[in-house]
Amino acid sequence: IDSAAQTVVVRNLDTGHEFTDQWDRMILTTGGASARPALAGLQLPGIFTLRTVEDAVAIRQWIDEHHPERGVIVGGGYIGLELAEALAAHHMHITLLEATGQVLPTLDAEMAAHIQAELTAQGVDVRLDCAVEAFAGSERVREVLAGGQHIAADIVIVSVGVKPSVGLARAAGIALGPTGAVAVDDHQRTNITGIWAAGDVAEAQHLVMGRPAY
């Protein structure tokens, strides 16, 4: 993106052909990507994140090919809980690891306690205040090291949030805010005239706190 010339260089990913196009106004919606913590063993086969259709297909293929009996979900947010339900439907023993003191940390503690009770009633092993330290295995993931414990695992899904995809914005000179996402005003305008940003790439204005949020 050349904001001064108001041009953008585009590459056709099928053919490799590149061309330059012009714009009068631009809306940047490059989204975000699953956060991947810098932990040893994260690259082992059998460890997944879930953000795209391709991610879901890869998870399903692993289940069909390896028939895992023990699943570990890292993160007790909305996606983590949905995954717990989905994997339990495949008759796995599910362990859910959450680094904070409750599942769904954005909820009131009283509400979260009811949800945790239901998870436990459905056979999910919920472990709170349990931060992951590393993943272990040789040819594939075999266990998760968390809270000083060794938890056996045939499949691991890491669901610890989203990070904004700001590489293109940064290269174009678009300012990032304190959260690391693109800074915008209450009309989604960036610091560059004629460029707006929205979605997972951009901050939002917290109506109660009166400050940027992500």
Residue ranges and their predicted role:
Residues 27, 48, 72, 95-97, ...:
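Hydrophobic/aromatic beta-strand patches that form the interior of the parallel beta-sheet core
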Residues 43-67, 139-143, 150-214:
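FAD-site-proximal beta/loop scaffold in flavoenzymes
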Residues 32-34, 54, 78, 102, ...:
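Residue-level detector of alpha-helix initiation sites
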Residues 7-10, 15-70:
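Glycine/serine-rich phosphate-binding loop and adjoining beta1-alpha1 elements at the start
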Residues 18, 36-37, 81-82, 153, ...:
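Glycine/Thr-rich phosphate-binding loops of Rossmann-like dinucleotide-binding domains
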Residues 31, 75-80, 148, 199:
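Conserved phosphate-binding and hydrolysis motifs of nucleotide-dependent enzymes
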Residues 58-107, 141:
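Rossmann-like NAD(P)H-binding beta-loop-alpha module
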Residues 1-10, 14, 21, 89-186:
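A Rossmann-like FAD-binding core segment of flavoenzymes
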